[in-house]
């Protein structure tokens, strides 16, 4: 498979997974969280898919496309753990989180996701859903939507 085909499959799976997750939490009260803004594609999709929800964002730096810059009040700039801790203190429940942090080194990415899992759990609402590119620890894994190859994206629910 070409790199282009692989990227298209990944992005399609991401979009389909986010749409599925948004439907799962439609009746819950709370905000949305994008952990890892990057160029802003996912943030843009989340704010369009869930227009009545506040979409919070965590990232080390603001480097997204100009059309995807979150409002200053919704952008928590810094390392993920202290930003998650800050968000937890606000007591604004997160009903849907997208986890997309990584260094590009599989072992390091998996370790980081595991280390951040308790801090992610601290901000999540009961019944909330997490869509993640990395395995998280301490959540109930869901099957997710049909058509997404196993392991492409991971889906979790907070019980």
Over which residues does each language-model region extend?
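Glycine-rich SAM-binding Motif I of class I
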Residues: 40-44
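C-terminal substrate-binding/active-site "lid" region of AdoMet-derived donor-dependent transferases
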Residues: 103-159
